[in-house]
């Protein structure tokens, strides 16, 4: 069945729009890697995260661009990745990135952390009276050796478990002490609703840190 819509909207299938909801979703194979926190802008990853929001596990698959494209290499890694996905809890999302290498030998699969940025960054290439040129450029930043971007560049296939949108309490935000004090000052007069073990909601306020 063919649908003409953005990738995330196609996840209406998870609601039974085209019959019984799927057991799992495979999004991709995308031409070009989706690594690091830049996956926020990926339609391939976005579709997988949307499926997870409906309680359906999903695998997002991307491969480096090459000539020729190494689609068979990516396909060979999809099956074992789906096996891992199906063994995980419902709503799990795995992000698989495949290097542009021949099928034989099959690249080693590594669990990886998300890189701070990604393989490329978006930049403004130029502006004119009625137009704007956007470009993809190298980040120029030293990579974390355990990150998905770094391992992919070394020829490994990478898998990362990711989550969609989640709320974070102010105390849990990864900020400096000064930033957290500023945030607490902003939220000082707002009640925080935290359900306890018994399901009851307790109201509390945020006190300044020393």
PLM region spans:
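Glycine/threonine-rich flexible loop motifs
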Residues: 33-42
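Hydrophobic/aromatic ligand-binding patch that stacks against planar heteroaromatic rings
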Residues: 47-51
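Electrostatically charged, flexible surface regions
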Residues: 73-210
């Amino acid at each position: 069945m063919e649908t003409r819509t953005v990738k995330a909207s196609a996840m209406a299938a998870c609601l039974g729009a085209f019959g019984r909801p799927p057991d799992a979703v495979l999004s991709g194979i995308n031409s070009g890697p989706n690594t690091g926190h830049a996956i926020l802008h990926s339609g391939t990853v976005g579709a997988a995260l949307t499926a997870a929001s409906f309680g359906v596990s999903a695998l997002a698959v991307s491969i480096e661009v090459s000539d020729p494209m190494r689609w068979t290499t990516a396909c060979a890694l999809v099956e074992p990745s789906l096996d891992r996905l199906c063994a995980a809890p419902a709503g799990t999302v795995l992000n698989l990135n495949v290097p542009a290498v021949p099928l034989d030998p099959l690249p080693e699969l590594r669990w990886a952390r998300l890189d701070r940025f990604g393989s490329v960054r978006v930049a403004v290439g130029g502006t004119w009276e009625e137009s704007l040129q956007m470009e993809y450029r190298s980040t120029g930043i030293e990579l974390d050796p355990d990150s998905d971007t770094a391992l992919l560049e070394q020829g490994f296939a990478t898998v990362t478990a990711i989550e969609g949108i989640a709320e974070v309490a102010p105390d849990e935000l990864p900020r400096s002490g000064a930033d957290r004090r500023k945030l607490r000052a902003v939220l000082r007069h707002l009640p925080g609703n935290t359900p306890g073990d018994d399901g009851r909601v307790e109201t509390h306020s945020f006190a300044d840190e020393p």
